[in-house]
A protein has these predicted regions:
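Glycine-rich beta-strand-to-loop/alpha-helix junction loops that act as flexible
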Residues: 21, 75-77, 100-102
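A residue-level signal for conserved active-site and pocket-lining positions in enzyme catalytic cores
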Residues: 20, 78, 153-155
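Short glycine/serine/threonine-rich phosphate/pyrophosphate-binding segments
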Residues: 79-84, 107
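Short beta->alpha junction loops/turns
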Residues: 24, 53-54, 77-78, 114, ...
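Catalytic core of DAGKc-family lipid kinases
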Residues: 41-42, 49-51, 90-197
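ATP/NTP phosphate-donor binding region
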Residues: 1-72, 82, 87
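Short hydrophobic/aromatic-rich motifs at helix boundaries and adjacent loops
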Residues: 6-9, 30-34, 57, 77, ...
Length: 197
């Protein structure tokens, strides 16, 4: 990153940074160190928290209600972003999010055309604009771009991290193939825009 580059909109901003250090194929922690240093060099105050086996990022969003954060920075994959969004929506918080996709497939980022600026993360601040996205509710949880159920739902959660690191997206395909024998229909009721289907 260009250490001389100054980005005025973050000067004086208080930023909550949520990092999944084991996300995807690259070292999220190394990228987080670079980004945190750049934010601080440009005058931001940064509170950084890392996800663990017992804290997926959702719980850290409680800090948004306790502090005056200008922005949440999420460095991780689809699961990390989903956890943060759920934590925020359950608390009715609308703090802007900067998402740095660092997962195995980054479906959310690809769907919205978010570039993977991990080698130069400051571009996520300097070359993008905030935009509103829709969120839906499925049972007690929220979703931002996809809600799934049925046969292949569990494969994204059941796929071992070691397989994802070795095989990337293909690891999900292999995991999903294990359940092909259980193919069956699922009854469904949907309420959208006040209409029941």
């Amino acid at each position: 990153m260009d250490k001389n580059l100054e980005y005025e909109p973050i000067r004086g901003a208080h930023i909550l940074m949520i990092v999944n250090p084991v996300s995807g194929r690259i070292s999220g922690e190394h990228t987080a160190d670079k980004l945190e240093a750049w934010l601080k060099e440009n005058g931001a105050a940064v509170d950084r928290f890392e996800t663990t086996e017992t804290e997926n990022g959702s719980g850290y969003t409680a800090k948004l209600a306790e502090n005056d954060y200008a922005r949440v920075v999420v460095l991780g994959g689809d699961g990390t972003l989903n956890a943060v969004l759920n934590g925020m929506l359950h608390r009715a918080l609308r703090t802007p999010i900067t998402y740095l996709p660092a997962g195995t497939t980054n479906d959310f980022a690809q769907t919205l055309g978010i570039q993977k600026h991990l080698l130069d993360p400051y571009k996520s601040f300097t070359e993008t604009e905030d935009r509103l996205i829709d969120a839906g509710k499925f049972g007690d949880g929220y979703f931002s771009y996809v809600a799934s159920f049925g046969l292949f739902t569990k494969c994204s959660y059941a796929t071992p991290r070691t397989m994802k690191r070795l095989l990337g997206h293909f690891a999900y395909v292999l995991e999903g193939m294990k359940d092909l024998h259980a193919l069956d229909a699922t009854p469904l009721a949907v309420t959208a825009d006040g209409k029941f289907f």
